[in-house]
Amino acid sequence: MSSSEGNSDASAPGTPVKSSTPSSRGSSPDSPKKQEPSKKRAILNESDDDDDSRPAPRQLSDSSDDNIHPRGGGEKSSPGAGGGLFGDLSGSSDDDSDREGKPKESNTRARLSDSDAESRGSLNDLQGIVMANPDEIDEDEKAKEHVHDTEMVTGRVTLEYAADPPHFVRMPNFLSVATHPFDPQHYEEDEDDEQAKLDDEGRTRLKLRVENTLRWRVRKDENGKEIRESNAKIVKWDDGTMSLYLGNEIFEVSLVPLNSNNLPHLYVKQPTLMSAQAVLTHRMTFRPHSTDSQTHRKVTLNMADRSRKNAQVKVMDDVGQNPEITRRENARKEEESLRAHIRRTQMVRNNFKVRGPRYAGQYSDDEDMPTSSRKGKKKEAPIIGASSESEDDHADTTKKSGSDSDSDEEYRKRKQQQKKQIVTSDEESD
């Protein structure tokens, strides 16, 4: 009776849930039925951390089997009456959660698969540019990537630098670098000049013998150890500036930082690959120290020669007469033709004056007509650039002019005599 009353008291309304479930305090260790709920409660406490495994709230259905009797009822409840209300709920919570969780997960997966199929079908129906899912692209790229592992034998090259890191240098046209070591026995300056005429970029370099060529050699010190020497050195001053001493020439050195987005690298070439050794962050430039240096004079002279316009010389293959002589001859011929034309016009005018209407019948046909009626003629000026032949022609013309003057005098005398005869005959007739 005590056990049944205890169960009926636990199943009374208004009592807490913890009191309804049998615990290990009021039960004996020999009853296995009272120990099972405690184990199931422990499982429920462990599943509280997982949100997905939490059981859904269960609705109690009103049935004739689950009637709740008051504490003072005359009917005795069976030992499992209280457990039908609360014990079964706590005892079967895990089973119910498993049964309800699996259908929900299957339903959600079915819905996702249906939505993916619908979205893919809608994408296939679209036309134009379709934005792809980046997750799908990554999966496709990973599937396409094939990594090939190959074995290669290469030499490990390590370069030793000074305290300062290496710099990028673009050599100007007035500086050269000899890559091979200097050997005075096999050195030939002429061959070196021919090799340094053009640089890698096709520019003509200024060769100043040994003044602007960086050289190095290998020699042994007192202990017999090989050391390297050079004819150039860089001096860093207190103010931070640097100078390059190359023989007797001095050049100013300046460092300029390079663009950080595109930095050049120093590589060592090997048969199958190129191994990077350092990153070059600064560029080094050189310029002559003063205008009195031999390098600066050489540079300025070279620029002046390129800017100077040389006179164009025409080469004549056919050698003929002197053009100056031919020009003078042509001028003389033109002058002679002009003088001859003037003489002809003057003679025509003079003849017209002599043969006037008054004296037309006074002359016979056999009588020679005077060539000119001028009392005197001006002496002709000598022709410019006249030759010996022209002088002979001039002498002939002077003789002819002399004979013409004589004929004119005879003509005047003859005319005066005729006038006298006419006058005397008129007087006699009177």
From Swiss-Prot:
A GO molecular function held by the record: RNA polymerase II C-terminal domain phosphoserine binding
Superkingdom of origin: Eukaryota
Chain coiled-coil ranges: 326-347, 409-429
Compositionally skewed regions (Polar residues) per UniProt: 1-10
GO biological process annotation, one example: positive regulation of transcription elongation by RNA polymerase II
Disulfide bonds: none
Extent of Basic and acidic residues compositional bias: 99-119
Null allele phenotype: RNAi-mediated knock-down is maternal effect embryonic lethal. Embryogenesis proceeds more slowly, with embryos displaying defects in the positioning and shape of epidermal cells.
Pfam family, one: Leo1
Low complexity bias (residue ranges): 18-30
UniProt-listed InterPro entries: Leo1
Subcellular location: Nucleus; Cytoplasm
Annotated Gene Ontology cellular component terms: Cdc73/Paf1 complex; cytoplasm; nucleus
Subunit text: Component of the PAF1 complex which consists of at least cdc-73, ctr-9, leo-1, pafo-1 and rtfo-1.
Role played: Component of the PAF1 complex which is a multifunctional complex involved in transcription initiation via genetic interactions with TATA-binding proteins, elongation and transcription-coupled histone modification.
Family, similarity comment: Belongs to the LEO1 family.
Protein name (database record): RNA polymerase-associated protein LEO1
